[in-house]
């Protein structure tokens, strides 16, 4: 919802029907470090553990270049999102869809922005269901080797059960503690991943050649690797919603604390991503797993702790990505269908949504391939070219200026990643589905 000051009577009515974290609430108590750990929680997740696997298909030079280029381009587009939040004096675009309406028009904007944002948010929630269950299973198997093995689908169900409870937290600010814990865990398990790889050392006869597959399969796997890298930069889809929790005054607009938080988040991002991608690939080469923790076996207690940290982190990540979806669903039920806003509506809409993502996650546990598919189809638009397109429309930089060129580079790279990794991810899901048992 677009917020402005003063608030009109119609907007005041809408505000009273909304959650406390939504745009119209005058209380915006978040500090700059809130945006740091919210952004870290949204951005650093399951994707960091698949970066060495992407390196195995891209190689040292191209892989490092793609990772560095992606980091730089998405930092620039994140800066654009922060600046565009209050690009109209007296108005705050508190949601991605609000900015889309302003840039593309009230009719076209939602059709361009909302599907992409929902793909990111719902896609992340599905992937995090799979990741949480998979790592929870790994944790128990390491700590209790004599326990009776339990099917992975049951662990995913157990992980999903946590979200039936946490999803009832009313607003973004109420999940701040969960998000902070998740951000700390991401830094910890990333350190364990690259630190454990150093302690493990290089495997005998390590090879840095491209993974041995037929030419057609290799091409699709490279496409999927691009999607896995783009998945690692998914925070843009909730950037405006995070900034909406920041106070703003003429002397200190919200873009100041938000940008401070983003810089902090990207520093943490670099500290996590580059060591994991490069060191873990150095240790295992083309034999690295799509979840690098699977390659580490010793010390057992440390690997078990890392898996548990991943579980805690994706619990927080799920909530960060789900909260805007909850807001959208509840507003739709109130405004379009006349439901009364309250605890009952919150319980049913959020429970149904969690059950939906849980069902899809249990049915399609293709962790690595899901990363590539959703990474290209959803994250490339929201993180690469949609911010750049909106910047060109709203700010209208001089043609052939540095800003103009940087935006067009982001657009071209983003479109290529979207097409390539979506094709590669879908093809790999189809190919690998024969090796999995549904509800395994």
Curated annotation (Swiss-Prot):
Keyword tags: Amino-acid transport, Cell membrane, Membrane, Transmembrane, Transmembrane helix, Transport
Pfam hit, one: Aa_trans
Localization per Swiss-Prot or TrEMBL: Cell membrane
Stretches assigned to the Cytoplasmic side: 1-31, 83-109, 174, 243-261, 322-353, 396-399
GO CC annotation: plasma membrane
Biased composition (Basic and acidic residues): 11-25
Biased composition annotated in UniProt, kind: Polar residues: 1-10
Topology in membrane: Multi-pass membrane protein
GO terms, biological process: amino acid transport
Transmembrane segments annotated in the record for this chain: 32-51, 62-82, 110-130, 153-173, 175-195, 222-242, 262-282, 301-321, 354-374, 375-395, 400-420
Start and end residues of each stretch annotated as Disordered: 1-25
InterPro entries, A to Z: AA_transpt_TM (IPR013057)
Extracellular side: 52-61, 131-152, 196-221, 283-300, 421-440
Protein family membership: Belongs to the amino acid/polyamine transporter 2 family. Amino acid/auxin permease (AAAP) (TC 2.A.18.2) subfamily.
PANTHER family given in the database record: OS05G0424000 PROTEIN-RELATED (PTHR48017)
Function: Amino acid transporter.
Name of the protein described by the UniProt record: Lysine histidine transporter-like 6
Source organism of this protein record: Arabidopsis thaliana
């Amino acid at each position: 919802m677009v917020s402005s000051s003063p608030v009109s009577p119609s907007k005041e009515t809408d505000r009273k029907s909304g959650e406390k974290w939504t745009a119209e609430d005058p209380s915006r108590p978040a500090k700059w470090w809130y945006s740091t750990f919210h952004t870290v929680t949204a951005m650093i997740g399951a994707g960091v553990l698949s970066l060495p696997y992407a390196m195995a298909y891209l190689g040292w030079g191209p892989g490092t270049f793609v990772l560095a280029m992606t980091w730089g381009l998405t930092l620039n587009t994140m800066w654009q999102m922060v600046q565009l939040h209050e690009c109209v004096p007296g108005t705050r675009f508190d949601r991605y869809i609000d900015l889309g309406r302003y840039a593309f028009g009230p009719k076209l904007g939602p059709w361009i922005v909302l599907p992409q944002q929902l793909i990111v948010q719902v896609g992340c929630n599905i992937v995090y269901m799979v990741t949480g269950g998979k790592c929870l299973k790994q944790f128990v198997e390491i700590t209790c080797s004599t326990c009776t093995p339990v099917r992975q689908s049951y662990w995913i169900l157990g992980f999903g059960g946590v979200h039936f409870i946490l999803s009832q937290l009313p607003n973004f600010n109420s999940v701040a503690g969960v998000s902070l814990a998740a951000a700390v865990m991401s830094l910890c398990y990333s350190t364990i991943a690259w630190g454990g790889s150093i302690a493990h050392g290089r495997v005998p006869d390590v090879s840095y050649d491209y993974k041995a597959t037929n030419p057609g399969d290799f091409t699709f796997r490279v496409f999927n690797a691009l999607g896995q890298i783009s998945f690692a930069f998914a925070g843009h889809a909730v950037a405006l919603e995070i900034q909406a929790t920041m106070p703003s005054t003429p002397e200190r607009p919200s873009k100041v604390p938000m940008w401070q938080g983003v810089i902090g988040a990207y520093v943490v991002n670099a500290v996590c991503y580059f060591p994991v991608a490069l060191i873990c690939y150095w240790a295992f080469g083309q034999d690295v797993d799509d979840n690098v923790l699977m390659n580490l076996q010793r010390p057992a207690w440390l690997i078990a702790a890392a898996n548990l940290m991943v579980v805690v982190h994706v619990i927080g990540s799920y909530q960060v990505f789900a909260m805007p979806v909850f807001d959208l669903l509840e507003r739709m039920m109130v405004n379009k269908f006349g439901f009364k806003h309250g605890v009952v509506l919150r319980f049913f809409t959020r429970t149904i949504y969690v059950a939906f993502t849980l069902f899809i996650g249990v049915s399609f546990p293709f962790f690595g391939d899901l990363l590539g598919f959703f990474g290209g189809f959803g994250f490339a638009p929201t993180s690469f070219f949609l911010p750049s397109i909106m910047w060109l429309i709203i700010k209208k930089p001089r043609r052939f200026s540095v800003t103009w060129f940087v935006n067009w580079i982001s657009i071209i790279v983003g479109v290529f990643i979207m097409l390539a990794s979506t094709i590669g991810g879908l093809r790999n899901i189809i190919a690998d589905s024969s090796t999995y048992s549904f509800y395994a």
